[in-house]
Design a protein with these regions (language model features):
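Nucleotide-activated sugar donor-binding and catalytic core shared by glycosyltransferases
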Residues: 1-198, 202-327
């Protein structure tokens, strides 16, 4: 959802009228658009939990989802369909073929998810966040870099008195990453480090009250968050590139279950090899790094590369969309 919001913001700035943009998402995704003057259609779209087999066995549910979308959007007058993947991507691909609409796909991970993999075999232009993305049709594939909020920046300089760690525990698998932080807080006292912990919707726990620890369910504008932290602890999903782009070092705890584990482990491998991140595969590794920081040991920061090779994809993707609109 966030790449779509960032893309829409850039399209507005380039003169594309809001009335020309419509969003199809689910109930959870629609919450991100509450304060935006844009047409958002919340639709209960079929989601396969068993990969390709699930789509094949539930063909009627997919047809129902397609018909719901066709009722909500005037596809006869639609010039572009854009998807960022997940369960809606195959439907977007089919609709682009059926209604002869220009189709764009954006893949946020180095190992494409099943949705984008299926969608990529429909006629389309594909944009990737990571170089050498696999598990996707390589035809018309362009490594543009990620779509980010271009307002973000990291103005914080590391001082000798306190190190601020931002924890993003609000994504898939948040229970594990949150529990690791709680375990550390239960076993240790925060003196020279401060933790800002995003726990995710409905995960706020009033019992977790510690010195130098702040807990929030959700941060809508990440600009302030990134400007406040020296280091980030998070999963290794596509959104992690945002922190890497502004040279915030990463301690990564990849999600270990289901198909998501593949793309997160590969994302993490790329970021570690590029010296943007270190891997924390268990509690002991995380505790070791935190305790070093408690001693104001800055050697961790010296290990990370400042030679940022990651591109920002916003302008390249927006230009292609506008070129298509102007045809």
């Amino acid at each position: 959802v966030l790449p779509v919001i960032n893309l829409i913001d850039d399209l507005y700035q380039r003169g594309i009228e809001k009335r020309k943009i419509e969003v199809v998402t689910d109930k959870r995704g629609s919450q991100y658009f509450k304060d935006r003057d844009i047409d958002v259609h919340s639709i209960d779209i079929y989601r396969s939990k068993t990969g390709m087999v699930g789509y094949m066995l539930n063909f009627q549910k997919m047809i129902k989802s397609i018909r719901l979308i066709e009722k909500k959007i005037d596809l006869k007058n639609c010039g572009i369909l854009f998807t960022t993947g997940s369960y809606i991507a195959p439907l977007a691909g089919y609709l682009s073929w059926r209604h002869k609409i220009k189709f764009f796909i954006q893949e946020q991970n180095i190992y494409a998810g099943l949705g984008n993999k299926i969608a990529s075999y429909f006629k389309s232009d594909k944009f990737t966040s990571y170089p050498n993305t696999i598990n996707i049709n390589q035809k018309n594939l362009d490594n543009t870099g990620p779509i980010i909020d271009k307002k973000i920046q990291n103005n914080k300089s590391i001082n000798n008195k306190e190190i601020t760690i931002g924890v993003q525990g609000g994504s898939q698998g948040s229970e594990e990453i949150n529990s690791l932080i709680y375990k550390y807080l239960g076993n240790n006292t925060l003196k020279n480090i401060k933790i800002i912990h995003i726990v995710g919707p409905n995960n706020f726990d009033n019992s977790k009250k510690f010195e130098n620890y702040k807990q929030v369910e959700f941060i809508k504008d990440m600009t302030d968050f990134y400007s406040s932290i020296d280091l980030q602890v998070s999963r290794a999903g596509g959104g992690v590139l945002e922190a890497a782009l502004i040279n915030i070092p990463l301690l990564l705890i990849p999600y270990k279950h289901g198909t998501t584990s593949t793309h997160q482990s590969m994302n993490a491998e790329y970021l570690v090899k590029s010296k943007f991140a270190k891997l924390c595969s268990n509690y002991e590794t995380l505790e070791y790094e935190f305790k070093k920081l408690e001693q104001l040991d800055k050697s961790l920061f010296e290990e990370f590369s400042k030679n940022n090779v990651i591109k920002i994809g916003n302008d390249s993707i927006v230009n292609k969309i506008i070129d298509e609109i102007n045809k």
